[in-house]
Each structure stands twice: as C-alpha cells, then as structure tokens.
From Swiss-Prot:
Pfam family, one: Aldolase_II
Organism: Escherichia coli O139:H28 (strain E24377A / ETEC)
UniProt xrefs under InterPro entries: Aldolase_class_II_sugar_metab (IPR050197), Aldolase_II/adducin_N (IPR001303), Aldolase_II/adducin_N_sf (IPR036409), UlaF (IPR023499)
Gene: ulaF
Protein name as annotated: L-ribulose-5-phosphate 4-epimerase UlaF
Keywords linked to the UniProt accession: Carbohydrate metabolism, Isomerase, Metal-binding, Zinc
Active site as annotated: D118, Y225
SUPFAM superfamilies named among the record's database cross-references: AraD/HMP-PK domain-like
UniProt function note: Catalyzes the isomerization of L-ribulose 5-phosphate to D-xylulose 5-phosphate. Is involved in the anaerobic L-ascorbate utilization.
Amino-acid positions noted as binding Zn(2+) in the UniProt annotation, renumbered to this chain: D74, H93, H95, H167
Gene Ontology cellular-component terms listed: cytosol
Reactions mediated catalytically: L-ribulose 5-phosphate = D-xylulose 5-phosphate
Amino acid sequence: MQKLKQQVFEANMDLPRYGLVTFTWGNVSAIDRERGLVVIKPSGVAYETMKADDMVVVDMSGKVVEGEYRPSSDTATHLELYRRYPSLGGIVHTHSTHATAWAQAGLAIPALGTTHADYFFGDIPYTRGLSEEEVQGEYELNTGKVIIETLGNAEPLHTPGIVVYQHGPFAWGKDAHDAVHNAVVMEEVAKMAWIARSINPQLNHIDSFLMNKHFMRKHGPNAYYGQK
C-alpha cells in the first residue's frame, strides 16, 4: 500500500499548490479495488506537516486497518461513491471558492464554452439539500447517497464532479491525480461561468454540436487529442 499512500499524499499536497484549499478544508482518496482498501487523508492534519506515512488506510466499511490518525471526516462519502461506481479510482472534496459559491447558490455550473466541454459532458450538476433527518443521522454517508441520487446510472467519468447544495464540490477520476486534475478544472470553469454570466446574464449554453466535438475528441472511442 506504500505506493498508493504516496500517490494519495502527493495528490493531497496538490490541493494547496493549486489554490483549492484553505487550512485543512479538503481531502483526496484513492482505492485499491483488488484489496478492497481505500487510502485517504487524515482528519484535520495540516498540509505543512503532513507526510505520506500519515495517510490512513480503511476497508470498505470504514474500519482503519493502517495508520495512526483518524481518517477524514468525509470518509463515508468517499466509500459510498466507490461502492456505487466501479470506474472511480480517486475522489477529492474541497471548498474551493467559485465551485463552492455555485453549491451555496444551489445552481448547476453551466456549460458555456469549450474549456468546460473538454472535461464535463454537460452542466456540472448540483444535489438537493439534505433533510434535517439526513444531517442529524449518518451525515457523511447521506451526502454520498444524495450525490448518487443525483447522478443515477450515468457514467461518472463523463461528468467527473458535482456540487453538493450548501456544502461544496466533489470531483473524481481514474486515480487520485486525475481526480485532483478534474477538481482544478471544475474550479476554473466555475469561475469562468460566474464571470461570463456577470458580463452577459442572458448568455446561452454552449452549442450542443460544439460540446459533443470537444468532449468526444478527448474522451470518445475515436479520441485524437493528445498523445498515445
């Protein structure tokens, strides 16, 4: 597990490097599906002092199997998403400013241009609010459930992120680094959408044919963006 712990540590350290977190407001995890184990950031540990060996290993029930610290308080959310979507290899949660602003506003992040379409096939969705019962009960587990309720049976890697109402963004990917990459893009397109709609409140969504072209040339079966 040392290799995965190092990967998760590096991905977590990317959060402050890319300006996605303030203090300890974020966490990254990754899963080893063969072993049924998840590596995640420890709860409340400062990035300045954190080391790879501080990463916590839990099983799919959330039981700590390796590590001296308690795992992230959002662990149950991560585990619920891993259980539901086998294509996910890494998950990240932050309170990055612009994506969180859309979450607090209770609005999807609209697909307005090609930067968005290169990564997200359509609007970045938002969840409903959790009920008082859901919050007072198994809050973090129910956060995962409301994300799943919103995504349904869609392929999560086609829209690798969501904003949880009144909370903040979650993003995911094929591994921990891919998840952070998508979280960075999510923050950038959230900022772009806010600025664009401020300039032109009547701005329409990106044309569907342009969205299809940009997404499929990068992610489709005949993708030709980048190198093999």
